[in-house]
Amino acid sequence: MSRRGSILHSRTQWLLLGLALLFSLVLFMYLLECAPQTDGNASLPGVVRENYGKEYYQALLQEQEEHYQTRATSLKRQIAQLKQELQDMSEKMRALQERKKLGANGVGYPGNREQAPSDLLEFLHSQIDRAEVSVGAKLPSEYGVVPFESFTLMKVFQLEMGLTRHPEEKPVRKDKRDELVEVIEAGVEVINNPDEDDAQEDEEGPLGEKLIFNENDFIEGYYRTERDKGTQYELFFKKADLMEYRHVTLFRPFGPLMKVKNELIDITRSVINIIVPLAERTEAFSQFMQNFRDVCIHQDKRIHLTVVYFGKEGLSKVKSILESVSSESDFHNYTLVSLDEEFNRGRGLNVGARAWDKGEVLMFFCDVDIYFSAEFLNSCRLNAEPGKKVFYPVVFSLYNPAIVYANQDVPPPVEQQLVHKKDSGFWRDFGFGMTCQYQSDFLSVGGFDMEVKGWGGEDVHLYRKYLHGDLIVIRTPVPGLFHLWHEKHCADELTPEQYRMCIQSKAMNEASHSHLGMMVFREEIEMHLRKQAYRTNSETAG
């Protein structure tokens, strides 16, 4: 027994020494890769010695810097993996030693400890078999296909853009960048260290050496996700001086569902302080109060309304509307704050948030053009938590009813316009004005930026404060929140950036792509109809 233990101890030492040497080698390669080039006469790759502009060299340097950053990240990840493997191996050897000692004392082990990892591995392999990787699936229509999105080392080409993303862009989220870098590294590893069952022969270079691929040999890739199975990656590599491509297919299977939390949430006593900044627009406020009375007073009954009014014109009308609703519905949970100054949405919401002095409260920052349901108010309560979560719902913005319902004599009532259709509106995924958050969280981040004047911008500033903090931001489209169409006026006093945002919002608010197209080609359509009518009349007369 002692001899066997000494042999095991000796093997453990050699194994740890080997892993340490391998770690040192990778670290040495990383230092060489990151070391600056000292050859001052060497030209940049692909650059002919001509007079180029400053922008050209800046773009080239930025591209090189991004390449080296990607490579450095790759090497750092490999070092971290080696450290983890070294630690895992040490723990395994330590556990083996402990088992040996316990076994000598006659202590037995249950035989099913390895059963769970084995079952999990079997499940993950079954996910590959279920996915549409090797064999196609029978689909009901052309819309059943899950399309791929393509990517290169620097760009992603995507189909689902919403209103804020671009057809071609660099991955903004760090997790997406890391995912694609990891996939390319895994593809390189598969090519350079093939399994015995891989149907490929080792390629040789011009001098007979084994070809070693790296990230720079990556040409393009495609990926798609089947929500219940996993993500499939198709990768293509090619050496610059060779005609053959190397194709690698990878699959990241989704594991079984795991319980994270099971809790009871009591929202029966949760009061929402709805804060509405307002200037003039008394007719819109009257319509808003109709929705408020139906939803908040008659159904929800756990609401406080705070209206922050700017200026003197229209103030008496707003007071009259509030008093009328109060007397008709016996509702007194409202506050009217009057500010004799120029309208500033951020300023109004700041004042409205601080006007509440009855302890912690959930706030809903709302505009006078918003229509919401009782179900949305409960979503507001469920998705905001003090010190943990803020809720930023995506509003469904309705198009101009005069265009949407142009074939009708008059547009239908507002309640009948609240439908989620492509020609009736769009998800306003570039807007961050409607939000549910607790007063303490709002005050802890400093509220709105008072330097932002006029239209837009202050919402994004507040949103970014939460993104840069520790709170979870819940961002999702919700069915019970609508932005009613109203004509926009972009003031000349706005900054160029604010004016651009205002015009962009105005254009997107007007009508769908198909309706705008019909308006552009209206004369051509009318001419076609006249020709058709003339031809029909001629044939009838003949």
Curated annotation (Swiss-Prot):
Sites carrying sugar chains: N41, N333
An annotated Gene Ontology molecular function: glucuronosyl-N-acetylgalactosaminyl-proteoglycan 4-beta-N-acetylgalactosaminyltransferase activity
Alphabetical list of Pfam families matching this protein: CHGN (PF05679)
Topological domains annotated Cytoplasmic: 1-13
Binding site for a divalent metal cation: D369, H486
The reaction(s) this protein catalyses: 3-O-(beta-D-GlcA-(1->3)-beta-D-Gal-(1->3)-beta-D-Gal-(1->4)-beta-D-Xyl)-L-seryl-[protein] + UDP-N-acetyl-alpha-D-galactosamine = 3-O-(beta-D-GalNAc-(1->4)-beta-D-GlcA-(1->3)-beta-D-Gal-(1->3)-beta-D-Gal-(1->4)-beta-D-Xyl)-L-seryl-[protein] + UDP + H(+)
Stretches of the chain found on the membrane's Lumenal side: 35-542
One GO biological process term: proteoglycan biosynthetic process
Transmembrane segments: 14-34
One GO CC annotation: Golgi cisterna membrane
Location in the cell: Golgi apparatus, Golgi stack membrane
Membrane topology: Single-pass type II membrane protein
UniProt keywords, alphabetically: Coiled coil, Glycoprotein, Golgi apparatus, Membrane, Metal-binding, Signal-anchor, Transferase, Transmembrane, Transmembrane helix
Coiled coil: 59-105
Job of this protein: Transfers 1,4-N-acetylgalactosamine (GalNAc) from UDP-GalNAc to the non-reducing end of glucuronic acid (GlcUA). Required for addition of the first GalNAc to the core tetrasaccharide linker and for elongation of chondroitin chains.
Family: Belongs to the chondroitin N-acetylgalactosaminyltransferase family.
Protein name: Chondroitin sulfate N-acetylgalactosaminyltransferase 2
Source organism (scientific name): Mus musculus (Mouse)
Gene this protein is translated from: Csgalnact2
